[in-house]
Amino acid sequence: RLLDASVEIVAEVGWEALSMTAVSKRSGVPRQSIYKEVGTKADLGRAVVDREVGRFLALAGEELAAHPDLETGLAAAVRRVLEVGRANPVLQAVLRPGHDAGLLTLLTVDPDALLGQVTDAVMALLGDQASVAMVDTVVRLMISHLVQSTVPVEDAVMRISRVAAAFG
Protein backbone atom coordinates (compact mmCIF):
# COMPACT_ATOMS: atom_id res chain seq x y z
CA ARG A 1 0.00 0.00 0.00
CA LEU A 2 2.78 2.43 0.86
CA LEU A 3 4.60 1.95 -2.41
CA ASP A 4 1.39 2.11 -4.44
CA ALA A 5 0.42 5.36 -2.70
CA SER A 6 3.91 6.76 -3.24
CA VAL A 7 3.86 5.91 -6.95
CA GLU A 8 0.45 7.55 -7.35
CA ILE A 9 1.65 10.72 -5.62
CA VAL A 10 4.89 10.86 -7.62
CA ALA A 11 2.95 10.39 -10.87
CA GLU A 12 0.50 13.16 -9.93
CA VAL A 13 2.72 15.84 -8.40
CA GLY A 14 6.33 14.65 -8.63
CA TRP A 15 8.84 13.37 -6.12
CA GLU A 16 9.58 16.79 -4.66
CA ALA A 17 5.94 17.20 -3.55
CA LEU A 18 5.73 13.77 -1.96
CA SER A 19 5.57 13.84 1.83
CA MET A 20 5.15 11.14 4.43
CA THR A 21 1.92 12.86 5.44
CA ALA A 22 0.57 12.58 1.89
CA VAL A 23 1.63 8.92 1.72
CA SER A 24 -0.07 8.32 5.07
CA LYS A 25 -3.32 9.89 3.92
CA ARG A 26 -3.28 8.09 0.57
CA SER A 27 -2.34 4.67 1.97
CA GLY A 28 -4.28 4.78 5.21
CA VAL A 29 -1.12 3.84 7.12
CA PRO A 30 -0.28 6.06 10.12
CA ARG A 31 2.70 8.34 9.49
CA GLN A 32 4.66 6.98 12.46
CA SER A 33 4.19 3.47 11.12
CA ILE A 34 5.60 4.59 7.79
CA TYR A 35 8.71 5.95 9.49
CA LYS A 36 9.10 2.70 11.45
CA GLU A 37 8.51 0.48 8.43
CA VAL A 38 10.31 2.46 5.72
CA GLY A 39 12.45 5.13 7.34
CA THR A 40 13.13 8.43 5.63
CA LYS A 41 11.80 9.86 2.39
CA ALA A 42 15.08 8.80 0.74
CA ASP A 43 14.51 5.25 2.01
CA LEU A 44 11.00 5.35 0.58
CA GLY A 45 12.46 6.54 -2.73
CA ARG A 46 14.88 3.62 -2.78
CA ALA A 47 12.01 1.23 -2.05
CA VAL A 48 9.97 2.71 -4.92
CA VAL A 49 12.96 2.46 -7.27
CA ASP A 50 13.66 -1.12 -6.17
CA ARG A 51 10.07 -2.14 -6.81
CA GLU A 52 9.95 -0.49 -10.23
CA VAL A 53 13.31 -2.04 -11.16
CA GLY A 54 11.92 -5.40 -10.06
CA ARG A 55 8.95 -4.94 -12.36
CA PHE A 56 11.20 -4.15 -15.31
CA LEU A 57 13.39 -7.16 -14.51
CA ALA A 58 10.33 -9.41 -14.42
CA LEU A 59 9.36 -8.19 -17.90
CA ALA A 60 12.88 -8.79 -19.18
CA GLY A 61 12.89 -12.23 -17.59
CA GLU A 62 9.61 -13.13 -19.29
CA GLU A 63 11.01 -12.16 -22.68
CA LEU A 64 14.31 -13.97 -22.14
CA ALA A 65 12.42 -17.12 -21.11
CA ALA A 66 10.11 -16.88 -24.13
CA HIS A 67 13.05 -16.45 -26.52
CA PRO A 68 15.84 -18.88 -25.60
CA ASP A 69 18.12 -17.62 -28.38
CA LEU A 70 20.35 -14.98 -26.76
CA GLU A 71 20.15 -12.44 -29.59
CA THR A 72 16.37 -12.71 -29.99
CA GLY A 73 15.81 -12.81 -26.24
CA LEU A 74 17.87 -9.70 -25.56
CA ALA A 75 16.14 -7.79 -28.34
CA ALA A 76 12.71 -8.81 -27.04
CA ALA A 77 13.65 -7.93 -23.45
CA VAL A 78 15.05 -4.53 -24.43
CA ARG A 79 11.98 -3.80 -26.58
CA ARG A 80 9.55 -4.66 -23.79
CA VAL A 81 11.44 -2.69 -21.16
CA LEU A 82 11.66 0.38 -23.39
CA GLU A 83 7.99 0.20 -24.39
CA VAL A 84 6.78 -0.19 -20.82
CA GLY A 85 9.33 2.32 -19.54
CA ARG A 86 8.10 5.04 -21.82
CA ALA A 87 4.68 4.74 -20.17
CA ASN A 88 5.88 4.13 -16.59
CA PRO A 89 4.44 6.84 -14.31
CA VAL A 90 7.42 6.93 -11.94
CA LEU A 91 9.95 7.19 -14.73
CA GLN A 92 7.89 9.83 -16.54
CA ALA A 93 7.52 11.87 -13.34
CA VAL A 94 11.25 11.70 -12.66
CA LEU A 95 12.09 12.76 -16.21
CA ARG A 96 9.48 15.55 -16.37
CA PRO A 97 11.06 18.97 -17.03
CA GLY A 98 11.40 21.05 -13.89
CA HIS A 99 11.37 18.07 -11.55
CA ASP A 100 13.43 17.77 -8.39
CA ALA A 101 16.40 15.54 -9.13
CA GLY A 102 16.09 13.65 -5.82
CA LEU A 103 14.66 10.44 -7.22
CA LEU A 104 16.65 10.70 -10.45
CA THR A 105 19.80 10.89 -8.33
CA LEU A 106 18.97 7.47 -6.91
CA LEU A 107 18.86 6.14 -10.46
CA THR A 108 22.01 7.76 -11.78
CA VAL A 109 24.46 8.54 -8.98
CA ASP A 110 24.34 5.37 -6.89
CA PRO A 111 25.48 2.64 -9.28
CA ASP A 112 24.10 -0.16 -7.12
CA ALA A 113 20.64 1.41 -7.00
CA LEU A 114 20.10 0.58 -10.63
CA LEU A 115 23.05 -0.41 -12.78
CA GLY A 116 24.56 -3.01 -10.47
CA GLN A 117 21.19 -4.45 -9.50
CA VAL A 118 20.01 -4.80 -13.10
CA THR A 119 23.33 -6.12 -14.44
CA ASP A 120 23.51 -8.76 -11.69
CA ALA A 121 19.91 -9.80 -12.27
CA VAL A 122 20.31 -10.08 -16.04
CA MET A 123 23.53 -12.07 -15.59
CA ALA A 124 21.62 -14.44 -13.31
CA LEU A 125 18.90 -14.82 -15.96
CA LEU A 126 21.38 -15.47 -18.75
CA GLY A 127 23.86 -17.63 -16.89
CA ASP A 128 26.92 -18.37 -18.99
CA GLN A 129 25.28 -17.32 -22.27
CA ALA A 130 26.70 -13.80 -22.04
CA SER A 131 29.76 -12.00 -20.70
CA VAL A 132 29.56 -9.47 -17.90
CA ALA A 133 30.97 -6.86 -20.29
CA MET A 134 28.20 -7.48 -22.83
CA VAL A 135 25.41 -7.42 -20.23
CA ASP A 136 26.84 -4.30 -18.57
CA THR A 137 26.99 -2.55 -21.95
CA VAL A 138 23.46 -3.59 -22.96
CA VAL A 139 22.06 -2.49 -19.58
CA ARG A 140 23.84 0.88 -19.77
CA LEU A 141 22.52 1.50 -23.28
CA MET A 142 19.01 0.43 -22.34
CA ILE A 143 19.00 2.75 -19.31
CA SER A 144 20.28 5.56 -21.51
CA HIS A 145 17.43 5.02 -23.98
CA LEU A 146 14.94 4.90 -21.09
CA VAL A 147 16.18 8.12 -19.53
CA GLN A 148 16.92 10.11 -22.68
CA SER A 149 14.99 8.59 -25.53
CA THR A 150 15.86 10.29 -28.79
CA VAL A 151 14.83 7.57 -31.23
CA PRO A 152 11.83 5.25 -31.58
CA VAL A 153 11.92 2.01 -29.59
CA GLU A 154 12.63 -0.13 -32.66
CA ASP A 155 15.66 2.00 -33.56
CA ALA A 156 16.96 1.75 -30.00
CA VAL A 157 16.47 -2.03 -30.02
CA MET A 158 18.32 -2.33 -33.33
CA ARG A 159 21.25 -0.22 -32.06
CA ILE A 160 21.52 -2.11 -28.79
CA SER A 161 21.26 -5.45 -30.59
CA ARG A 162 24.11 -4.50 -32.92
CA VAL A 163 26.32 -3.60 -29.99
CA ALA A 164 25.44 -6.84 -28.19
CA ALA A 165 26.20 -8.86 -31.34
CA ALA A 166 29.67 -7.30 -31.52
CA PHE A 167 30.55 -9.14 -28.30
CA GLY A 168 30.08 -12.36 -30.29
Regions found by a protein language model. Give the residues of each.
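Amphipathic alpha-helical segments that line or abut small-molecule/effector binding pockets
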Residues: 4, 54, 71-86, 136, ...
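Helix-turn-helix
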Residues: 1, 5, 9-43, 47
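Phosphate/oxyanion-binding loops and surfaces in catalytic or ligand/nucleic-acid-binding neighborhoods
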Residues: 84-88, 145-148
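Short, hydrophobic secondary-structure boundary micro-motifs
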Residues: 19, 90-96, 154-155
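Short, basic, alpha-helical segments at the C-terminal edge of helix-turn-helix-like DNA-binding modules
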Residues: 50-58
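Amphipathic alpha-helical packing segments from all-alpha helical-bundle domains
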Residues: 57, 89, 93, 101-136
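C-terminal peripheral helix-coil segments that are non-catalytic and often amphipathic
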Residues: 116-132, 136, 141-168
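Hydrophobic alpha-helical connector segments
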Residues: 43, 47, 60-87
